[in-house]
Amino acid sequence: MTTAKLAVLPIKDLNPAEYNPRKKLKPGDKEYEKIKSSIVEFGFADPVVVNSDMTIIGGHQRVTVAASLGYTEVPCAIVDVDKTQEKALNIALNKITGEWNQELLADLIQDLQNSNFDVGTTGFEPPEIEQLFSKVHDKKIEEDDFDVEAELKKPTVAQMGDVWLLGKHRVICGDSILPETYNVLMEGKKANLVLTDPPYNVNVEETAGKIKNDNMADEDFYKFLFAAFVNMEQNMEADASIYIFHADTEGLNFRKAFVNAGFKLSGCCIWKKNALVLGRSPYQWQHEPCLFGWKKGGKHQWYSDRKQTTIWEYDRPKASKDHPTMKPIALMAYPIQNSSMMGCVVLDPFLGSGSTLMACEQTGRICYGVELDEKFVDVIVNRYIEMKGSADDVFVIRDGEKVPYAHLVRGGDGD
């Protein structure tokens, strides 16, 4: 950025920025009257910042008030920057005082993020940005009614080793305990959050069928979890958090593997369901625990307030028979919004029926998932397509070739 040049310019030659996110002031507004009193008392002592094309970057309100006082020209500091830098400078100059138009500000920051611009230079910290996006863009999380059972009866399309591209999301059909699975999936990226629901080792079987790796000897199950958790730890950012749903009956193995893999156990959250789940125990289960933590010796990001508790009350999915231990989308969206920002990568190494991916889609995050069972990869793919209403942004990378989903199905692959 070059040094600003000072000049006195006619107000009629200055162009207000159409994107300016500041709320427009009018006579009688407290801020308007403050600016007016200052100009009357001290004159126009603070130059307006304008770009070389005469677009006002900082000083819209002062120009408006000055014109109302009869000024025809004002002192200006002229800079020569591109439009992306101009927008960032607008935010930075206006951050200290005044009120924002929240929607315009959120759109402007999103525009900068989409241009890969470092929005930190605007003076807004990540938690402030996420809070802003939450106010403006967050909407009620919607559950779906995708028929998983019907999908499971169809011929399997997915194959081991496939990498599915579902819009901005990536799903690999592979084994979550193998490092090479993550090498292919992540492409060198690191996850900003891990949220997953591994097999519980309780030998669950419902109409959707058994979960793979759900009936192991105690020591084997620990080794399985440890291997998976180590891969998660190695593919997370230093400040990423991790959430692990599990069964209380296997709590010892989960906690032992969690800590030994390199995580700090901060606490255990509880999903309180609206109805019990019939089982063999004298006490019927109406909750599921979820480990919460982050890397040992590291830090973690938090984007919510201090009023959140360890009890999460969400109704079970009406079609929970679709996948054993299936989670509602709103439940998965809750920790996602607490521990990540829009545009962040959320890793789920046990994607199952895809609730994490559905929650990421609705909250503006990017899901990178692993699923071992080909038939449930099909469930994830078609659940996404049904939510989007189109398969236009769905592709599979198979044998080094990127194939549109429509071509794959039309070609009869898997029939």
Region locations from a protein language model:
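S-adenosyl-L-methionine
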Residues: 162-183, 381-415
